Amino acid sequence: MSSHLARLEALLFVAGEDGLSLRTMAQLLEIPVTGLTQSLEKLQAKYEADEDTALCLLESSNTYKIVTKPDFACLLRDYSKTPINQSLSRASLEVLSIVAYKQPITRAEVDDIRGVNSSGAIAKLQAFGLIREAGKKDAVGRPNLYATTDYFLDYIGINSLDELVAIDQLELEEQETSLFREDAPEDLEDLDN
């Protein structure tokens, strides 16, 4: 079984920018808060001692999160200024689609739909101005809600979200396309068989 430290790091990684409270981490890890505090101190010491990691532990308003070290601020600022004309990754496009159709939505809800962590894609989409924080969800931990921006509408060439293709329509078109792609005979001779 994984160490408490590895399990703690995994939870904080998946929590992303929302972070986790001491109480939530203690419940999930099934350890007392005193033991958790010691583990957090060990994790912070590990990050500080390792010059080959860009990560550090940040505590803010009784919430802990894994973030990049301040030394990398200039590099990340330059990255965030990268022009939007470069193509978005498949992951970013998936996240953008989910946010567009399900907004407002939390990162955890996006993760549930995709089955993987979406923190990086969300950060990139925010940096490009395609999505924004749209408040906090009234739930445990008060996670951020995300929604698309006016720039998103301009970027995809529509005037309002009402102009998005209905999901049912997309599913129907996808099924029709897959019928012709996957189930189509390799050549016309197969039609006779």
Curated annotation (Swiss-Prot):
Q: Which Pfam families match?
A: SMC_ScpB (PF04079)
Q: Which GO terms describe its biological process?
A: cell division; chromosome separation; DNA replication
UniProt-annotated location(s): Cytoplasm
PANTHER family in the record, alphabetically? SEGREGATION AND CONDENSATION PROTEIN B (PTHR34298:SF2)
Species source reads: Streptococcus thermophilus (strain ATCC BAA-250 / LMG 18311)
Its job: Participates in chromosomal partition during cell division. May act via the formation of a condensin-like complex containing Smc and ScpA that pull DNA away from mid-cell into both cell halves.
> What is the protein's quaternary organization?
Homodimer. Homodimerization may be required to stabilize the binding of ScpA to the Smc head domains. Component of a cohesin-like complex composed of ScpA, ScpB and the Smc homodimer, in which ScpA and ScpB bind to the head domain of Smc. The presence of the three proteins is required for the association of the complex with DNA.
Give GO cellular component annotations, separated by semicolons.
cytoplasm
- What protein family does this chain belong to? Belongs to the ScpB family.
- Swiss-Prot/TrEMBL keywords: Cell cycle, Cell division, Chromosome partition, Cytoplasm
Q: What is this protein called?
A: Segregation and condensation protein B
